[in-house]
């Protein structure tokens, strides 16, 4: 302050206090600010920042609204939708809860989705994130390994979330992470092994702290950590983790536990096909997951178990035509862009569903079946202008030959037009 005139009384430009009344006065171009005003401004900014980082409960959909939204995109699985809706709603209420009021701290409840392949586990998680307008990241558990081994570190899961939040850490800390194929990191045997299981139990151990809530150090460019790089610090306490897996073989563990064996007259003989896999999974308990290969600590950090049912023929047919982004609607739109109408007969939809069940791919296999059926005709349509309608019937699913409705002008005119068009655009002498 020596460069200023001592005789001139300096005052804070905001509160008007003189330099004798405050501890420190900071000078700017023609203005001054005291330490008290700096502290006050800092408190205002901090309060506003904390308000912005909270999820507005008034705008947060109620559980019934969440389920109704899921109904638009996911067919069936009503019990799973209800469980997810309640869990997600409670999770974001927990984020906004004030521990200082009554000293009651709400613990985080991550979700474990169990269901056969193609039952809608991934779609449910994606649809939830879209509704809530929060950052969402998907990860594949099969690529994860314990730190120090070839593969991805578990922290790379958090990096995907940070990237999807445009590197807004506070926004990412309220996001949702879906870890698929979580059953693939089960340890190889029920009993602990003396050999190191770097892609099974080792990954489960590495995920424990992140699932529970910790301040994780994430490499900004991904990959392996090394001591000379800077890290992004992110608190996972308010990140909702949804883990999903098909858990092939878990049904046999449940069946073995629940099967009642009796001898002599009056014994009940149960066939293996008596219960659907989805029905068996509903009876799963933590003990079954332990025998499957998940460690107790990992099971404890996924307290909410949601079971999805296998999809039958009627459910798959509804999936084909009812959702807002149904496959039938998608392919109709694709052909309409070439001015061609597409019609799926009901028997064709049932045949597609039957083939998906036979392949044991669930809803995930529906697109590949339609793609195989439509491939040749979608190849021909842009070149053959006489096709105005394509009809997919039951026989089409078997022989891959759709029924075509042609224009009344005949087949020769489009070929002539097409030939002239090709010559004009491809002949180097006329170009």
UniProtKB/Swiss-Prot annotation:
List the InterPro entries hit by this protein, alphabetically: AAA+_ATPase (IPR003593), ATP-dep_Clp_protease_ClpX (IPR050052), ATPase_AAA_core (IPR003959), Clp_ATPase_C (IPR019489), Clp_protease_ATP-bd_su_ClpX (IPR004487), ClpX_bact (IPR046425), P-loop_NTPase (IPR027417), Znf_CppX_C4 (IPR010603)
Does the entry feature the keyword Transmembrane, yes or no?
Answer: no
Where is the region Disordered? 408-431
Give residue ranges for domain ClpX-type ZB: 1-53
Asked if Zinc is a keyword of the record, the answer is yes
Alphabetical GO biological process terms: cell division; proteolysis involved in protein catabolic process
What CDD domains does the entry give? Answer: RecA-like_ClpX
Q: Which SUPFAM superfamilies does this chain map to? A: Glucocorticoid receptor-like (DNA-binding domain) (SSF57716), P-loop containing nucleoside triphosphate hydrolases (SSF52540)
The entry lists its GO molecular-function terms as: ATP binding; ATP hydrolysis activity; ATP-dependent protein folding chaperone; protein dimerization activity; unfolded protein binding; zinc ion binding
Q: Which UniProt keywords apply?
A: ATP-binding, Chaperone, Metal-binding, Nucleotide-binding, Zinc
Record: residues binding ATP: 116-123
- Family per similarity comment: Belongs to the ClpX chaperone family.
- What is annotated about its quaternary structure and interactions? Component of the ClpX-ClpP complex. Forms a hexameric ring that, in the presence of ATP, binds to fourteen ClpP subunits assembled into a disk-like structure with a central cavity, resembling the structure of eukaryotic proteasomes.
What is the name listed in the Swiss-Prot or TrEMBL entry for this protein?
A: ATP-dependent Clp protease ATP-binding subunit ClpX
Q: Which source organism does the UniProt entry give?
A: Clostridium novyi (strain NT)
């Amino acid at each position: 302050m020596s460069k200023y005139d001592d005789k001139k009384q300096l005052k804070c430009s905001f509160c008007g206090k003189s330099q004798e009344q405050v501890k420190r006065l900071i000078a700017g171009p023609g203005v001054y600010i005291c330490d008290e005003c700096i502290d006050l401004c800092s408190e205002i900014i901090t309060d506003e920042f904390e308000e912005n980082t909270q999820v507005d409960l008034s705008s947060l959909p109620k559980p019934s609204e969440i389920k109704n939204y899921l109904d638009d995109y996911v067919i069936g699985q009503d019990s799973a939708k209800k469980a997810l809706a309640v869990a997600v709603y409670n999770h974001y209420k927990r984020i906004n809860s004030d521990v200082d009021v009554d000293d009651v701290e709400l613990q985080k409840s991550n979700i474990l989705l169990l269901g056969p392949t193609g039952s809608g586990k991934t779609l449910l998680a994606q649809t939830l994130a879209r509704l809530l307008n929060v950052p969402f990241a998907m990860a594949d558990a099969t690529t994860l390994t314990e730190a120090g081994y070839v593969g991805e570190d578990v922290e790379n899961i958090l990096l995907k979330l940070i990237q999807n939040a445009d590197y807004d850490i506070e926004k990412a800390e309220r996001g949702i992470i879906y870890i698929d194929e979580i059953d693939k990191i089960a340890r190889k045997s029920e009993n602990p092994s003396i050999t190191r299981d770097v892609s099974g139990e080792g990954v489960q151990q590495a995920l424990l702290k992140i699932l529970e809530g910790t301040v994780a150090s994430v490499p900004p460019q991904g990959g392996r950590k090394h001591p000379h790089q800077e890290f992004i610090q992110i608190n996972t306490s308010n990140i909702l983790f949804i883990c999903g897996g098909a858990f092939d073989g878990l049904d046999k563990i449940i069946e073995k536990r629940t099967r009642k064996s009796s001898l002599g007259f009056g014994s009940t003989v149960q066939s293996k096909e008596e219960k659907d896999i989805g029905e068996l999974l509903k009876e799963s308990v933590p003990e079954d997951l332990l025998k499957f290969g998940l460690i107790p600590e990992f099971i404890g950090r996924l307290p909410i178990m949601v079971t999805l049912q296998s999809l039958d023929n009627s459910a798959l047919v509804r999936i084909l035509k009812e959702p807002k982004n149904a496959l039938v609607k998608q392919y109709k739109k694709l052909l309409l862009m070439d001015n061609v109408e597409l019609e799926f007969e009901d028997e064709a939809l049932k045949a597609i569903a039957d083939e998906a069940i036979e392949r044991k791919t669930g809803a995930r296999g529906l697109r590949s079946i339609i793609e195989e059926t439509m491939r040749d005709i979608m190849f021909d349509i842009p070149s053959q202008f006489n096709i105005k309608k394509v009809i997919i019937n039951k026989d089409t699913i078997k022989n891959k030959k759709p029924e075509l409705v042609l224009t009344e002008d005949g087949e020769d005119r489009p070929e002539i037009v097409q030939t002239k068009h090709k010559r004009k655009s491809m002949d180097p002498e006329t170009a």
